[in-house]
Amino acid sequence: EQERVSGLRFKAGIFSNLTHDHLDYHKTFAEYLRCKKLFFDNLPSDAFAITNIDDRNGLVMVQNTKAKVVTYSCRSMADHTCRIVEQSFEGMLLRIDGRESWSCLIGQHNAYNLLALYTTAVSLGADPEEVLVAMSTLRPAPGRLENMKGPKDISVIIDYAHTPDALENVLKTLREIAPDRELICLFGCGGDRDRTKRPEMGQIAQKLADRIIVTADNSRTEKTADIMADIKAGMDLNGRSRSLFIQDREEAIRTAVMIAGPGA
């Protein structure tokens, strides 16, 4: 719609998922979907439209494309498939199209990302074995499920998660890897952005974390207290009783370290 890629000719387009984001601009989810779909509608016939059919909009995105459709999935039959064999904080073992591959990345969402990468490379003519070898050398991006060594045998995981879907993916991943450890979630929401996702993120945090610390996260022109109140609105009494609301981010981080015991 903004024609940011107007005039460019793409060899491939990848649809991974469509989640709650950018609604401050698009206003409705349907409009957000329509704008995303335009990209695939305009792909040339000699391109590849690569889509995640595990997302409910995966097939909708490519229903009018002229490009060759290639599907991928971690849950069902598709042109290319993947599943997590095992995972820890150090990485995960994947089985992609029947071949095993180790990755330093963790989480189901990263399994999807790696499968999308693999599907695209193979569709464009790369050798599958060479792609898997190259994928095994990839390191996590800073601030994306970044594993920091904390004090007192505490695991500290930093992630940019700024949407409900991203926060849920991160917390679920940590729960799966360490189901018996206490999970403390420290987060905030940016100011002058989509306000409707704030209570949803509060609800997700109370559902998946043992303790929650809500703090500032680039409030821009908004009052931090107002942003925190929006997050709090998504929590019930139980969630609020397990939460601390600390505006100063440095103080919030110090508090998280202080209340975290060994094994957290």
Q: Where do the model's predicted regions map?
A:
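Short amphipathic alpha-helical segments
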Residues: 4-7, 27-28, 61-64, 169-171, ...
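Short glycine-dipeptide loop
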Residues: 45-49, 179, 262-263
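Alpha-helical segments flanking ligand/cofactor-binding loops in enzyme cores
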Residues: 30, 37, 41, 172, ...
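Acidic, Mg2+-coordinating active-site environments of NTP-dependent enzymes
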Residues: 1-2, 6-156, 233-244
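Active-site beta-alpha connecting loops in nucleotide-dependent enzymes
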Residues: 140-143, 165-167, 172-238, 249
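Conserved phosphate/oxyanion-binding catalytic-loop motifs
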Residues: 159
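C-terminal structured "cap/appendage" subdomains that terminate the fold
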Residues: 235, 243-263
